[in-house]
């Protein structure tokens, strides 16, 4: 913190910070994590303390109330929506309020280092039942990723982005192996559909940073079931509505 001026820390698999079992309610584990955070905050008040916890929701609420941010995995729901399949595509768990949390400390993400890429899933398994809207087509895949970006970034709370997500990286996580080095695809910037996704991602992030309507102190209402999803933001400065049709 003092030497490198970092903004905070992300701690890996903190459910394992215990001598007992990893699940359930563990007061000792919570006290250990809170002691670590309190020490960090004594040097830098407000430093980000992010946990990859994967614990019981009640324990995650307790940690969130203490000031932690915690990862929330909704990748598979975003993948199914992008591919054009609605059975497992609800984004409701991407919103902290749906989990009964008081604080907007749920860090959700559309892609991560542990999950398959959406563009790859679209290319390999996307809904191709409608020839005029074949999800496996790169241009159509990128437009559908614009929708996942819209919801993935504007749902209230902090977000995590993975490298080249904004350009629709479509090489499998298992090519050639899960932890193998993946080639950078700088040429994606010259591909028109990918470049459009890049620009749209920037616009959406700018909206979130520039307008209080998309901040933590807005009234947020959402229907994120089924193919057609919508969000409504109500704030004294401006109201906003976002709608996405994930159907094919």
Name the predicted role of every residue range:
Residues 120-138, 178-184:
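A solvent-exposed, charged loop/short amphipathic helix patch at secondary-structure junctions
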Residues 145-147:
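Conserved interdomain hinge at the start of the Helicase C-terminal
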Residues 142:
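Substrate-gating cap/lid region and adjacent catalytic-acid/histidine neighborhood
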Residues 1-10:
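An active-site-proximal structural segment forming one wall of the substrate-binding cleft
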Residues 7, 14, 25, 121, ...:
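N-terminal/domain-start segments enriched in small and hydrophobic, helix-friendly residues
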Residues 13-115, 150-154, 158, 165-238, ...:
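Active-site-proximal helices and loops of the catalytic beta/alpha 8
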């Amino acid at each position: 913190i003092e030497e490198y001026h970092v903004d905070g820390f992300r701690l890996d698999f903190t459910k394992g910070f215990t001598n007992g079992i990893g699940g359930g309610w563990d007061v000792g584990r919570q006290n250990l994590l809170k002691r670590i955070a309190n020490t960090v905050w004594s040097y830098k008040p407000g430093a980000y303390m992010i946990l990859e916890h994967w614990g019981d929701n009640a324990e995650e609420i307790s940690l969130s109330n203490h000031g932690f941010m915690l990862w929330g995995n909704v990748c598979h729901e975003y993948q199914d929506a992008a591919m054009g399949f609605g059975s497992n595509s609800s984004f409701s768990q991407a919103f902290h309020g749906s989990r009964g949390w008081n604080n907007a400390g749920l860090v959700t993400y559309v892609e991560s280092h542990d999950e398959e890429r959406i563009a790859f899933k679209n290319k390999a398994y996307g809904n191709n039942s409608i020839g005029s809207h074949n999800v496996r087509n790169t241009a159509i895949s990128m437009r559908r990723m614009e929708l996942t970006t819209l919801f993935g970034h504007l749902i209230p709370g902090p977000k995590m982005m993975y490298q080249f997500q904004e350009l629709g990286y479509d090489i499998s996580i298992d090519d050639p192996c899960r932890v193998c080095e993946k080639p950078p695809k700088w040429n994606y910037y010259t591909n028109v559909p990918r470049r459009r996704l890049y620009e749209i991602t920037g616009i959406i992030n700018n909206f979130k940073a520039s307008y209080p309507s998309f901040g933590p102190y807005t009234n947020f209402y959402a229907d994120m079931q089924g193919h057609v999803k919508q969000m409504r933001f109500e704030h004294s400065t401006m109201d906003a509505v976002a709608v996405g049709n994930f159907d094919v």
